[in-house]
Each structure stands twice: as C-alpha cells, then as structure tokens.
Amino acid sequence: MLPNFWNFQFIFVIFCWIPIVVSDEKIVLKIGSISSRDNAKMLESILEMAKKKMTEQGVLGEKLDIQIITVEGCGASFEGVAAAAELYHVQKVDAYFGPYCSKELSPVATMASYWNIPIFAYTATSAEFANTKVYKTLLRTSFQSLNSISEATAAFMAHHNITKAAIVANIGTDSFEKIQSLEKALRSRGITVARRVMFEEAASAQDLVDNGYMNELRDNARVILPIFSSTRDLSTVFRNATWLANMASPEFIYINPLIVARNSEEPPVFYGKMAQKSIKAENPNTIQIYNSYGFSDDLLNEFLAIFDQNQRIYIDEKDLFNYVALYESFCVFAKLTEKYLHSLKEKPEDGKIRIDGKALWNMAVGMTFQGVLDNVIFDNGAERMTSFSAFYVDEKRDQIRTVSLINSTVTSKNCMDPVCIELVVSDVVTKFWSSPSGKLPDSEPECGFREENCDYTQTIVIATAVVCIILTVFLGIWLRRACETSALDKMPWRVFRDDVQILDEEQVKSVVSLNSASTKMSQVETKLIKNHAIVGVNTHAVYDLYEQRQNIRFTREDLILLTKMKQAVHDNINPFIGVSFNEKSELLLLWKFCSRGTLQDVIYCEKFAMDEKFQGAFVRDITMGLEYLHSSPIGYHGGLACWSVLIDKNWMLKLTDYAVCDPLKRWEKHGRINCKVDNEAEKQWQKMASLYVPPEIRTANEKNRLKRMDQKWQGQTILKRQQSDIYAFGVIIYEILFRSLPYDEKVDLTELAQKAAEGDKIQKPSIQRNKKLNPDLIALLQDCWSDQPDMRPTIRRVRLATEIALKTKGNLVDSMMRMMEEYANNLEKLVGERTKLAEEANLRAERLLFQLLPKHVAIELKAGRTVAPKMYDSATVMFSDIVGFTKLCSASTPIEVVNLLNKLYSEFDTVISKHDCYKVETIGDAYMVVSGIPIENGQRHVANISAVTLGIMDLLKVFEVPHRRDYRLTIRLGFASGQVSAAVVGLSSPRYCLFGETVNIAAVMESSGEGGRVQITETSKILLENEYPEFIIEIRGINKDVKQDDFVTYWLTGKDEDYFKKKNNTFDF
C-alpha cells in the first residue's frame, strides 16, 4: 500500500483532474488568479467582491458558480509560470487571471493559447500583447496600453492638424518600446516624426543644452513628445532644459502621453488633487494625454463605495486601475461564460463541459458591458478600449483643464473586420493655449525651420517695388501739386476786361426779348434787374460789379475755390463764367444769364399764379442743387436767398452766387473792394439778406467785422456752412409756399434785418397761425430753423421729406416726359400684342407644315438641314381610287366636287388618325397611305393598313354625297408590303415621296382591283396570317397585270373580332 501521504496526494490529483461535470443543479468553473506576494490577499478579495456582484445580478447562482484559486507569482524565479502549469495540470482551471507582473504574463499567455484556455490580462500594457496570432486567447482588460494611448495621442494631434513632431526620450529598453508604439500610431495618421532625440538617463538639464539636443529639437520641430522611462524622473530635467534653451514659450507645444510600458513601472501620476499638483509642478504649460479618470477622484470614490460594501481593507491607490480592471475582468468572464454555456446546442455525452478559450475570445470581440463608471468596449483584438482625455496644464490656473475628450466608438465606415473601433476627438475647450489667439500654433513655421520654404527674392522684389511705388506716389503727389499750382496760376476762370461787353438798358431789352419764350409767364415783372454783358462772342452773362481799390492777390485757397466753381456742372447749378479783376478798378463776377429772372421775381409777382406743381418743382430743384453743392468739392452755397435762385427758359431753377460770399467779405474787410451798391432796390434786398443767415453765422460775421485788418479772419467749417444753407433753405420754402417771409406781418422787416445784420438777437422764423401746412413740413421747417446747428437735418433728409410731403417726382419738364413715357409704354404694349399675333400665326403655319410633312422631317427642314433618303426594310403602302369618279364629276359642278372630296378625305383622315399611319398625298380622287414610315413599327404596319382599308369600306356604306344623297360611292383599295425608300424631293416646295417596287405593286393592286374590294399581295397575306390571323383573306388568283410570273393576289374581306375568344374556347375544351 502507498503511504498515507502519497495516498492522499493521489486521491487529490485524481479528484482535481476530473473535468466539469454538468448536473441539473449547478456548473462549477475554476479560475486561477496568479498574483504577487504583496497583494495576493487584496486581489483575492476583489475577485470575491466581483463574484458577489455577479451573484446579485443573477449571472452566478443555482446553475453556475465560479471557484477562485489564488496562487502567488511574480518572483525572481518565474514562480508564476510554474504556478500556471500546476493550475492547468493539477487544478484543471478553466481560465487565468494574471499573472500580475508583465515578465510572467508573456509565457503564461503563450501556454494558455496552446491549451485553448482564456486568460484575462488586467495589468498588460506592453504593445506585444496586441499580437493575436501569438496570444489567441488573451483578453486585455487593463485601463491603458502602449498602443491604445499612442493611438489616442495620434488622434488628438491629427484633430488639431499637427503634421510634424519630434520625440525626445532617454536611452533604454522601456523608452524604445514606447517610441516604437507611438511612431507606429503617428504614421497611421499621416504625422511625420521629424526627429528622434535620445540622451543618456544620467544627463542633466545643462547637459541637454550643451550637447545640442535642445537646438536639434528647436531646428526641426515645434511639437515635441517627451517619452521617458520611469526609472528616473526626467520630466523635471527636460522641463528645466526647455527654460535654459528659451523653448518654454507658447511657440512650442509639448504633448506628454503618460505611458506605462510595463506593470513594474509606477504610473507617472495617480489621480485626483495629488496628481494635479504633481503634474502642474513638473509640466506647466503642456498637454497631457491620459486616462479620462487620471486626474479625477471619481473612479476611486466609486470603487471604494463598492469595496466598502463588502469589506474594509486598505487599498493601495497606486494600483487602483489594476484593481478595477481585475474586478471588471471577473464580471466579463462570468457574463461570457453564461453566454457560452447557453450557446452549446447539446450537452456532451459524458456530461463534461470544457471552456473553449478561442470561442470565448471571439465572443468578447465587440462586447459592451457596464463597468464601474461607464460602458466598456472590446475592440477587434479583444482589447478594452479606454476613454482618454487631453489635459492642459495651465500654470496660471489651480486646476488642470480638460480640453479634449478622446472616446472610442463602434463604426462600420470603411471597415472589413467584424468589429471596428474609431477614436473620436471632441473639443471641450477650443481657445485654451496661452497665445493671443488661444489656438495651438502650427506644427511648422510658415517659412520652415531653416527658411527653406520661403523665397526671399520675391520679398526683396516686393519691398523694392513698394519703395519704388512709395517714391512714385510721392513724386506723383509732388508733380500733381506742381501741375495743380501751374493750372491754378493759369486761372481758367479769369475773364479779361477787354472780352466783356457791357450792355446798356436798350441792349438788354433787345437781347432778353429775343431769348424769352412767348408765354403768359414770360411777362413777369422783375423787381431787381442785374447787370448784363456779353462775354466773348455770344455768351450772355449777368455780373456783380464791385469797386476795386487795391490789386487782389488770391491765396491758394481762393484759387482752388474759384477753379472748383468753374468746374461745377449740374442741371440746377448756374454756370460760373469767371472773374474780371485788377483792370479799370473794377471787380466783375460773371454768371450765365437765365431769361426768367430770379425766384424772388416769381414769388412776389402778383400776376403769376403758382400752383402746387410749381411749388413742388421749385422746391425739388433747389434741393437737388444744394445736394450737389454739399457733395461736391465746393461743399456749400454760403449765400442762399430767393434772389440767388435763377429760373431758365425751361422753368428750371438754378442756384447762383454760391461760395463767393465769404471771399467778398474778406476782401472788403481788407479794403481791396467796396461792396456797397448805388441801386436802392438792390440796397434794400442786400439788407434783407441777413434774415436768411442763422444766428451763429451772424455772430461770427459781426466778430469778423469788428476785427482789425491785421487780425486773422475767422472762417467757418464746411459743416457749419452746410447747416447755414439748411437754415436759409427753410426760409425759402416758406416763401415759395406762402409768398412771404416767416415772420409776423406786423413786424418791420427792414428794422429786423438791420438788427440781424448788426449781430443782435432777433426772433426766430416761425409758421404764422393763419398758414395751413402739412404736419411733416411743419416739423421739417422747425428743424431747419433750430438754434442748435447740429439738430438741423441734412440736405438728403430735406430732399426726401419734401418729395414725400409735396409729392414731387421731378421738375415741370418731367411732367411732359412722364406723358411721353406713358405713350411709349402703350406703344410697347401694342408691339407685344402684335408680336403675340405673329407668334400665333407662326404656330398655325407650323401645324400646317407638320400636316404636310412628317414632324421630324419638318423640324429638320426648318432648321435648314437636309434630310437624307432612307430605306425601310418593311412597310405597307395603300392606294385607293373612287370608281366612276370621272362620270360623277361630269354631272357635278367644280364646287360640288371640291366639297365632296373635302368631306370624304376628312372622314378618311379621321380613320387614319386612329391607327399608326401617315397620309402621303392625295391626287384628285386617288389617296395614298403608308404605315411603318417614317416611324418604323415592326410588323404592325400590315395590320394598321388592313384596319384602315376595312374602316374606309365601312365608312362608305353610310357616306352620303352632299349634293346627291341617293348616290353611293364605290372605292377600289389595294396595298402591298415590302421594302420602301423615302426621301424629301424639292427645295422651295419640298414633298415627302415614296419609291420602290412595293409602291408600284401597291398601285397595281389598286388599279387592277374591283370596286368595293381590297386586293393585297401574297407578302401582305403571309404577314397577316403569321402575325394577325384575325383578318379574313380569300385568294383571287394570278394577277397578270403585275409583270411577274405567277403573281398571286388575294382579297381582304374582313376581320373576325371573336377570333381570340374562339381560340381560347378551343384551348379550354
């Protein structure tokens, strides 16, 4: 007998070797957890906690249970590998959880793949475990791996259009593995690795600068990826090197993927506030790519809440991600096992169930389940897809900011695998970078790192061109000013005194009578007769004469102003002819003569009846002229009054005496001219001019008058003078509407004007109580007379308001133009009607053409194109002739014959229109019809012609001759089938004609036939028998009229309408 010890061992081995036995009560599975010596108890507790969770959810229970076997590994002698073998051979486990350490995971996963046992790697981070050809049953549930965080980093960079980057790392195996994984992910996104800078781990920050590593990075990249192993914290060293090399500015982007290559490494950060403080101190102003929960306490708090419900054991927070991954791994295994057992179609004969590792792996592909915090997705390689985030370490803020979310989603776009996962980057914050724009800088300078992308030749050429252009502009300005000065010095507006012929009173009356129109309105008496002159040969002008006491020297401003006045051209501006000065002690201002005098003459002429049309037209002309002056280089009028508005022979108002008021006063102040006049009427109205001047201008004028000659003349801005024009325009509107000034009738206007001229404050213009006026115009006038210049409306607003209130659409001439326009519109309407009639006639002609010729032939001929002859392989041609038509014609008048044929052929046309046939022509009583031409219709042409002939025969049975009701027409019909040629014959009078043997035979069939019968050829008979047997045919015999031997013809006698019913009845029988 065996000793007791060996007997016990043998029994234990035999018991453990027995596979899972399926009973009606429960299936028990075994899992082997290979932990480390330090945390074996903790890992076992987490598995028990997960088992309890699955039991509560009903996954485990009466029918399924999982037995947890924990062994220690991760020792110096690969104890975990031996333990894995023992678990398989002795314990007969159904799945592995672990090993906890990476060095033992690879051999255990290889053995599990060979044994077809599922293995859950909850701490696997190395990229080598992504090889599904080697690790066929490995399911990775770890929160992050080299390939996953590398893909997340590449996705973030591609989302921000980063195309080039450099990698800096220390020399070492772990760093090399990280670099390989990261470069692979970058290449897949089209991102170029410009440089890979490697340095010794013992290097200091100063060494990195002195050895040229930092310069190499600066010269090749603006986006830098620091990848360091965890054996020594090099992040601070590299960060100090960036400060020493002046590379800590926002011009450079540091993207730090927090990668853990192996489980033996400590994670670069933990989570929560401690992690934020650590990262901010070591990596300010950088972007960290890390697990979405890496800088938050959410995962820890949620897991602690679950853990505390079971047992209170201290949790090493550094291993939090591994603990959560182990917890979720057990839940995944339980759910997959349940699904796997349900997928078994039948129980094995021996009742023993073995877990198929590869089948379980396939079930995990694309699986989604609820994890501790969110849903967990397995990709096409049965690897957990973790949610990552991009964190911006802003040294100016207390907290690390989440700028982008990098989530995994299932997609079917351009995917051939069973399950495809796509990384989707969504921005949380868009403008976060510490730059003026808040956006990430470009991955490469615009001109390249060595200015290789910029051709400075072009810049130099452009700079030279710009300098040349600037010099040219300055030279042009100088030349323009010189030319302008030369032009001003030439004084185009100067009129020499010898060119001016002063007219006396008799000469003026003679000239005015010749130029004035003979209308009742030409008899207006003028209260103020200006001086008249002839300038040059025949230019009739009026002038203002001033005594000149000293020679006048014009300033540059005076020269520019007078030149602008000479150049002013507008329908409502009176042309300025020029100035005669420094001759005969006289200063003459010459303006073009307007035959109907001034607006003042019309307003205060009692004989002249001024209706609303005149008022509206006058106001409109003044506003148009003022608007032109205000928008022109002159800028203002400066002396607007009712006598400075002239009326030409077409009753169009023209502004005159513009822009000269200020120079005249200045010259008078300096003693160069005398503005006093001798004419009493003119003196009176000269005094009244102050009533058109606003208060602020009157005050300024009085101040200028009181100044000494050596004191500077106080001028006014263009805007102030425009506002002054609006004030005067308000007064003129009132005069036009009411033929009086806007003051009370009891007021002495002469005294009021004297006070205004002396600068005293006088009453404002106002609308008198007995005057009725449009409310809009009342408001407009009150605005025009406002004491505050800035409150006065612009001339554009005045024009629009007066056009609406006075309903003006132009001057008096415009009314006549509108009548002519209405006539033109009526003429246009008449032309349109006639054009419509022509189009209708054209349509009728077109319809007639389509009746004479086939439609497609007519379209081609209308387009000017020729229609080529065409041979038709199969068609049927029919001829008809009325028997005894000649005799009938001899007994009838021509009109009766025409009416007969018109009625008969109209009936024939009706019969033809019901079938696919075309009437070729009619000659007297002969009628020619074809089917299959010009549109081919297979073999249906013979049936169409047959139906037409029978229809004509039926028609004639009831047809009555209009002028002989008792007379019955008899017709001969004949047709033939075969080849026919068709062509258009003639140019000026085209005809559509048919040619060929078939046409000739069809004519013989008609001519050799009998009245009231239809004669057909044997070809037509064969087509009817083969294709349309419902038609009734009788043989006639050999027709000797046809020049062919033994030519047999037939009679078409009718159509059996019940043919197909009889045929169907025969078949049914």
Curated annotation (Swiss-Prot):
It is found in: Cell membrane. Mg(2+) 2 binds at D881, I882, D925. Mg(2+) 1 binds at D881, D925. Residues 24-458 are extracellular. GO terms for molecular function: ATP binding; GTP binding; guanylate cyclase activity; metal ion binding; peptide receptor activity; protein kinase activity. Keywords: ATP-binding, Cell membrane, cGMP biosynthesis, Glycoprotein, GTP-binding, Lyase, Magnesium, Membrane, Metal-binding, Nucleotide-binding, Receptor, Signal, Transmembrane, Transmembrane helix. Residues 876-1006 form the Guanylate cyclase domain. It catalyses: GTP = 3',5'-cyclic GMP + diphosphate. Residues 1-23 form the signal peptide. Its EC number is 4.6.1.2. GO terms for cellular component: plasma membrane. The chain crosses the membrane at residues 459-479. The keyword Cell cycle does not apply. Residues 480-1069 are cytoplasmic. The keyword Nucleotide-binding applies. Glycans are attached at N161, N240, N407. It is a single-pass type I membrane protein. ATP binds at L503, D504, E505, E506, Q507, V508, K509, S510, V511, K527. Expressed bilaterally in ASE and AFD sensory neurons. PROSITE patterns: GUANYLATE_CYCLASE_2 (PS50125), PROTEIN_KINASE_DOM (PS50011). Residues 497-806 form the Protein kinase domain. It comes from the Eukaryota. The protein kinase domain is predicted to be catalytically inactive. Belongs to the adenylyl cyclase class-4/guanylyl cyclase family. Guanylate cyclase involved in the production of the second messenger cGMP. This is Receptor-type guanylate cyclase gcy-29. It comes from Caenorhabditis elegans.
